[in-house]
Amino acid sequence: MMRFTPPAEPANFEEKVRKAGNNWLVKNPDTKPKDFWSTFKPELAKCCHNLCNYSVMFIPSRMGTIDHYLSKSKAQNRHLIYEWKNYRYALQRVNSCKGTYDRQILDPFEVEDNWFEIILPSCQLILTDTVPDGDRDRAKFTIKQLQLQNSEWVIEQRQEWYRMYLENELNLEGLEKKAPLIARAIRKQLN
């Protein structure tokens, strides 16, 4: 993980999502929320440079999802279902793993850039010593629950980005745009 800056709310979000969604909730209080947010997925993806806010690797917008950081499935979060500030761009698999854990999972808008690093050549994600003591347990839980540390699917994806760099299919500047944590690990090796 690395820190992402919360994107600015789109100009027409208020009308198309917040008002429409909250009006729908008033009329359907006991029903699963209607998806008004997905029309803004391409915009959220673009604001995040098509990087999953959790795995920090490129995903095309059609493969990404809008994660409700505070789960839309919990009654106490219903007022946040149609709030832009509650949306994170995530790989579907990561979003599914996150489930309803909410604040047990670190928020990509609140972590610091140097809390995690990739170890090469294994491509495993580790916590650094810079993670504050008060956040270490959540950080460990986050990478375990979201399968970000060393699960087969994430290692395979990271190794492919690393291979592309090693075989000159992608330069370091290009890698920085597609898998910034791997680019950071390479820069660390080069210094």
Question: Can you name each region flagged by the protein language model?
Answer:
Residues 50-57:
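Local cysteine-cluster metal-coordination motifs and their immediate loop/turn environment
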Residues 65-72:
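Histidine-centered catalytic micro-motifs used for acid/base chemistry in nuclease
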Residues 44-48:
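Sequence/structural segment immediately N-terminal to covalent heme-attachment motifs in c-type
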Residues 1-43, 57-61, 78-88, 92-191:
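Extended charged
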Residues 51, 65, 90:
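The −1 position to Zn-ligating cysteines in a subset of zinc-ribbon hairpins
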Residues 74-76:
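Non-heme iron-sulfur electron-transfer modules
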